[in-house]
A protein has these predicted regions:
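N-terminal binding-site loop/beta-alpha segment at the start of enzyme catalytic domains
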Residues: 1-85, 121, 165
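Active-site beta-loop-alpha junctions enriched in small/polar residues
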Residues: 19-21, 50, 85-89, 128-131, ...
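A short acidic, helix-capping loop that chelates divalent metal ions and anchors anionic groups
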Residues: 51-55, 90-94, 134-136
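Surface-exposed, interaction-prone regions with an acidic/low-complexity signature
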Residues: 79, 83, 90-91, 96-98
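Glycine/proline-rich, positively charged
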Residues: 94-179
């Protein structure tokens, strides 16, 4: 497998996507996919607190739980680069923290919840799933403000800085950041 170094983190050029684990794939199938990826030199996997897709309150967090169970069983945490994401403002996800936001309290809680499900004490790449600003979601054109004021980017970044300083995350990112 080709390995690329990004900001000091060595990652395989192929990333194992996990968004169907817990909805379209069972835990056993997820573990088979992780075994296969590891056997073929893939060391990078992407997940999110809202997974699996299609997102529902009943299945939320299952993907991270499946990963955590596999890591606990196999003891291979150090061999993997794990990326996960916090869910920002979206009325469809009101079952997360009574309406997820990218404010300090929600980011810190989301990270702690992901760490618990992943059964690890750090996340290699912690991303905001969508920015807390107008953006297209799932191909939506335009943007409708849903009432709540958006969290200032500075507050989001300071919360991420706190997580980094505490050793809970190594790097930060933004998923779906296209305006």
């Amino acid at each position: 497998m080709n390995i690329k170094t990004i900001n000091g983190i060595e990652v395989s050029k192929i990333c194992l996507g996990t968004m169907t684990w817990g909805e379209q794939n069972t835990e056993a199938q997820a573990h088979e996919q992780m075994n296969y990826a590891a056997e073929h030199g893939i060391n990078f996997m992407d997940t999110a607190e809202m997974y699996p897709v299609a997102p529902r309150a009943e299945t939320q967090g299952l993907t991270e739980t499946y990963i955590g169970n596999w890591l606990a069983k196999n003891g291979q945490r150090e061999q993997w680069v794990i990326a996960t994401k916090a869910t920002g403002h979206n009325p469809a996800f009101n079952y997360l923290r009574n309406g997820p936001k990218l404010n300090r309290a929600h980011i810190l809680a989301a990270c702690d919840d992901s760490l618990r499900r992943l059964q690890t004490d750090y996340i290699d790449l912690y991303q905001m799933h969508w920015p807390d600003r107008p953006t297209k979601m799932f191909g939506q054109l335009g943007y409708v403000q849903h009432g709540d004021p958006l969290t200032p980017s500075e507050e989001t970044l300071r919360a991420l800085e706190t997580l980094g300083s505490s050793g809970k995350i190594s790097a930060i990112g933004l998923s779906n950041g296209e305006p």
